[in-house]
């Protein structure tokens, strides 16, 4: 009996010691977040939730965002995956260990999403090791941070109308009856819901993840291939399985291959800098159509990254400095429409871009910052980022996803 009592007392003491150690560990975690940066995106996201404890994401601190307040019951039940080491150039960098449910992320956008202008050579320091981010885009960075499947569905030069059409938010239809014979091409007309002719440069929809055959679309759940000649559109069946003729009727919906195949849990949208909209309300309606088509309410809206006087709505502004890191007219409209789902990416890049990738500001950067402009070291040209800029952009998207509880 006494022996049993001693055993029980010992167990209680051991449990108490364990709880004390865990408590000390949790306390250390909260008091020693890298760089002590609790505001994260708050400077560039006016409506951020003050209850969230947020740290900047830096190369030294890819997991600094994990807080108990943000942990949901689903997170606690999710399987813990030890992320494998990823070979980056000649250096192996550990991704660490994160808790998440395996999800898919679809990044739809234009050349900014595609990653036009990424650097041939770009390196930063990660945990004392050199990390090669040459050629990285923001979806690459997002995949690095989350460990999830990320689709780069960016196409250079596309307008917001074209992106929304490619994603399926704005629908396409067969304009008139046509018969497609096996192995033969026939002219076809495709229109939108208003009857306007549709001619996309990329009908398969995959953009940066374009390892598929060109211009594949689904009509009535059958795969077809489109071709262009003399400003006309032609269609034929895809593959060798079709033996007879296929009759396509007027009004049948046409869906890009990517819109058909990619059923993402999380949507990240970036568009508008190439036009395709005549009012902020029209652009917002395009975003909303894409969100509705996706079937998910887990989405992030990335604000335009151009300096105000170089943006699509540049006539609204006399100088960049008058706007600074405040929301401009365009950003205000998006924030009012989408609330906490919106990132003022331009302001983030001004306030935190250089710090996120560990770059010291040059004289030109300091001049840019003083005049409310995105630092030159992050850019390839006036509108596109280099890999440092895209890395910082991806880190900001990751942080927003943390705030929203997406990963």
Task: Please annotate each region the language model reported.
Residues 104-113, 149-154, 265-271, 298-303, ...:
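Structural recognition of the beta-strand scaffold that forms the well-ordered cores
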Residues 150, 163, 363-407:
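Histidine-centered active-site loop/cap adjacent to the catalytic His
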Residues 347-373:
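Mobile gating loops/cap/lid regions near enzyme active sites that modulate substrate access
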Residues 69-70, 78-85, 90, 291-293, ...:
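Substrate-gating cap/lid alpha-helix
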Residues 46-263, 322:
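Serine-esterase "nucleophile elbow" of acetyl-processing enzymes
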